[in-house]
Amino acid sequence: MKRRRLAQHFLRDPSVAEYIAGLVPSGLDVIEVGPGAGALTIPLAKRSKTVYAIEIDKALAERLRGIAPPNVVIIVGDALEVEWPRADFFVSNVPYSITSPLLFKLIRHRLPAVLTIQREVAERLVARPGSEDYGRLTVAVQCFYDVEILRVLPPYVFDPPPKVYSAVVRLMPKAPCVDNFDEFEKFSAWLFSARRKTLRRLKLADSTKRVYQLTLEELVELFKRHKA
């Protein structure tokens, strides 16, 4: 089954699957979202204590049960809605249509992660202040993670091949920049809805600096002053 409605493209290249699995430390409890036919699940299971595979498609989940080793626990449901089990690491070939909400849920769990996502989204995650890619998602993720693009993947390693390139990204938790993510995220969303306006125009500071030019540290300082 090709889940075009979810914009998911299944990994088909065994060498890429082995590469991604090899990025996960051995002996951990791992959550995998969107296992599909199990191309990544099987090599993950070989090096993990437990793999919790969250699959929304019942038919695919049943097919996976037929090939998965005993240390794979299959959870049928929507990864955005089901409660995630306690785990040490997170892995996903992320369905394009849920990339942002899945990232926001991941932030709340603060798990280290290896994700395969659209290259343009990956570039947003590592974007620097002042660039066109720098925005709300950048700030939210960089507040809690060190982000690194490890590898760019061509369309032909997926089935069906997407129209764009993908990227393997590693997210490693760091000391959070704020204590209250939900409040900070709402503030960032409001700010970046006016990304080209100056702080003076927004009556936040006597500065001609524009929102998209602010560093993470400057955004945090504005947030703290706004809360006070």
Swiss-Prot record:
EC assignment: 2.1.1.-
Similarity remark: Belongs to the class I-like SAM-binding methyltransferase superfamily. rRNA adenine N(6)-methyltransferase family. RsmA subfamily.
Record-linked CDD domains: AdoMet_MTases
A GO molecular-function annotation: RNA binding
Biological process per Gene Ontology, one example term: rRNA methylation
NCBIfam families: ksgA
Main location class: cytoplasm
Pfam families, per the entry: RrnaAD
Coiled coil: none
Zinc keyword on record: no
Subcellular location field: Cytoplasm
Protein name: Probable ribosomal RNA small subunit methyltransferase A
Key words of the record: Cytoplasm, Methyltransferase, RNA-binding, rRNA processing, S-adenosyl-L-methionine, Transferase
Listed GO CC annotations: cytoplasm
Superkingdom field: Archaea
Listed InterPro entries: KsgA/Erm, rRNA_Ade_Mease_Trfase_CS, rRNA_Ade_methylase_Trfase_N, rRNA_adenine_dimethylase, SAM-dependent_MTases_sf
rRNA-binding is among the record's keywords: no
Species in which this protein is naturally found: Pyrobaculum aerophilum (strain ATCC 51768 / DSM 7523 / JCM 9630 / CIP 104966 / NBRC 100827 / IM2)
Top-level EC class: transferase
Binding residue positions for S-adenosyl-L-methionine: H9, L11, G34, E55, D78, N93
Task of the protein: Specifically dimethylates two adjacent adenosines in the loop of a conserved hairpin near the 3'-end of 16S rRNA in the 30S particle. May play a critical role in biogenesis of 30S subunits.
